[in-house]
């Protein structure tokens, strides 16, 4: 169903990404004070969805499993592009990727 595909792209991946980032930070930053002191508005906005209910999101992710898995794979490919550009000290490629991502501004004003 096309609705499920689009929902996986614009809603479900945002929640999964937020949950994963929160887990990454919580695992690395054992001292909660560091998280609080260093957290910027961008971080807070990004992990805001990690406060969402597991009881609500588990069935949603299970019901739309195939689409969510496809979107996660696509997301990981994009993360790999950033990782490779950063590892290669390729500022031009990093800039290119960011400019490409900035096109979202035309959609989300």
Enumerate the predicted regions with their spans.
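Conserved Rossmann-fold dehydrogenase catalytic segment
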Residues: 1-15, 33
